[in-house]
Amino acid sequence: KKYNAKATFFVTGSHILNTKESDIVNLLKNGNEIANHNMYDIPYKNIPIKQFENDLIKTKSFLNKFSKNLPKWYRAPHASISDDMHEIIKKHNLKHVVGDVFANDTSIPDANWISAFILKNVKPGSVIIIHMPERGIREWNYLALENILKGLKEKNLEIVTLTELEQKSAK
């Protein structure tokens, strides 16, 4: 809210099962969107394609509890995707999203390095990948996000959802 930022949150089905519904509802009320990140945070490229599709559908049904008008976005866990997975994604009218700015925030526990890397590499239209901090998990991302949002504002870059980005680029 402080930076008038909106985002697309790629959510796994397993995360939905372990999150208070009110937290997801509040994300949506604040102008954010939620999108499909499949059931588990695993590299589905190594999983039978039928399980991939079943997990994709299951996650979509969980997400539909919060929004009947879900965005069409999908992001493969670990950015690992096969041709067969891509076909299934298209079959379900989803578009696979790949970010162009990722500071490996899951492995580098340094908020200043993460934010500096992102701010150095971001440009208008960039899709930044940063993982949600949680108590005890990736807590360094709280500070990284604060630094990034402040830096993006200083660069006069608007922080929008993927749907808004697509709409702006179509103009």
Located regions from the model:
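Conserved, mostly hydrophobic/aromatic
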Residues: 34-37, 59, 74, 96, ...
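Solvent-exposed, polar/charged alpha-helical surfaces in well-ordered, non-transmembrane soluble domains
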Residues: 25, 54-57, 61, 83, ...
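Acidic-and-aromatic substrate-binding clefts and catalytic sites of carbohydrate-active enzymes
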Residues: 11-19, 42-50, 75-81, 104-111, ...
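Active-site beta->alpha N-cap acidic-glycine motif
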Residues: 1-43, 47, 51-65, 71, ...
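A cross-domain feature marking catalytic cores of carbohydrate-active enzymes
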Residues: 11-13, 36-38, 76-78, 100, ...
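His/Asp/Glu-enriched short active-site or ligand-binding loop at hydrolase and phosphoryl-transfer sites
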Residues: 80, 86-121, 157-168
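Basic- and aromatic-lined ligand-binding clefts that recognize polyanionic substrates
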Residues: 65-81, 85-89
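Terminal accessory/targeting
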Residues: 1-8, 25, 120-171
